[in-house]
Regions:
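Acidic donor-diphosphate engagement hotspot in glycosyltransferases and nucleotidyltransferases
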Residues: 24, 52, 82, 106-108, ...
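Short loop->beta transition adjacent to catalytic acidic/histidine clusters or analogous donor-positioning motifs
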Residues: 6-8, 29-42, 51, 65-68
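Acceptor/aglycone-binding surface of glycosyltransferases and processive sugar-polymer synthases
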Residues: 72-88, 93-96, 102-181, 208-224, ...
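N-proximal low-complexity "stem/linker" segments adjacent to membrane-targeting elements
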Residues: 1-30
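A conserved acidic beta->alpha catalytic loop
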Residues: 45-54, 101
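Conserved donor nucleotide-binding strand/loop of the catalytic core
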Residues: 39, 53-88
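Hydrophobic helical membrane-anchoring modules
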Residues: 1-6, 146, 153, 176-254
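Donor nucleotide-sugar binding loop of glycosyltransferases
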Residues: 17-21, 48, 78
Length: 254
């Protein structure tokens, strides 16, 4: 059995995930005690129009010492939800998956095990061993990975894999501008620029069984393209200024 980490903040973004939310929180409550001695679970409701907000509040009320809910009044975007989750986290290690249950909470143990390796990485990112997504999303992902490699030198295998683990200290002082799907890439680009080490580990990926995916919507893709080129042009114009743009990821801990 992998040695447990002392304290872990786990969060997930959720937009119209009423069919997945309760099951994911119950899965986390059952699984995280084997991964961390102390943990918290944060549900980030990104302006959902279904019962996601109400269910998140019910779960927080039922487990007040462990579960918290963060709400966006409107749908601000995937990156904005990740930023809110990172900002709400209180512990030294911070992990997230998506709210669609295409990753299992137990697989965070693969990431914590890698974090404890001799090279002591600052960040561990998962890569999907075999994607369980429609073909169009797989095509988008391959093109996106190639573009990030060419224009930013980002060599991570699976930039947008929603299974990541951070040492909180690695995020201190970082700012990310994108509030959309480009958030993860921008974060990894700025972590590398800050000299932080990133390790990778393969994780299983499971088919979505409830709810609807929004990652391939034209509006989401166009926003990511816009943010991609905005950062690239700013880095060419003034690298140091570009790296300082955006909103801070962390808030002072209470």
């Amino acid at each position: 059995m992998t040695e447990r980490v002392p304290r872990l903040s786990y969060f997930f973004p959720a937009h119209n995930e009423e069919a997945n939310l309760a099951g994911l929180v119950e899965e986390a409550l059952a699984t995280l005690p084997s991964i961390a001695e102390t943990f918290e679970i944060i549900a980030v409701n990104d302006g959902s129009r279904d019962r996601t907000a109400a269910i998140a509040d019910e779960l927080a009320a039922a487990h007040p010492d462990v579960v918290r809910a963060v709400h966006h009044p409107t749908n601000l975007g995937y990156g904005a939800a990740l930023r809110s989750g990172l900002g709400a986290a209180r512990y030294e290690l911070v992990a997230f998956t998506d709210g669609d249950r295409q990753f299992q909470v137990a697989d965070l143990g693969r990431l914590t095990e890698r974090l404890g390796a001799a090279d002591h990485p600052d960040v561990v990112v998962g890569f999907r061993i075999k994607r369980a997504d429609p073909p169009i999303r797989t095509i988008y992902a391959r093109l996106y990975r190639l573009a990030n490699r060419i224009f930013f030198g980002l060599t991570v295998t699976d930039v947008d894999c929603a299974c990541k683990l951070f040492r909180r200290e690695a995020l201190e002082g970082l700012r990310v501008e994108s509030g959309g799907a480009f958030f993860s890439a921008e974060l990894l680009i700025k972590l590398r620029a800050a000299g932080r080490s990133v390790a990778e580990v393969g994780v299983p990926h499971y088919p979505r069984t409830a709810g609807s995916a929004t990652g391939a919507k034209p509006s989401v893709v166009l926003r990511a393209v816009r943010d991609f080129w905005a950062l690239r042009l700013r880095l060419w114009a003034n690298r140091s200024r570009a790296l300082r743009r955006g909103q801070a990821l962390l808030r002072p801990r209470p």
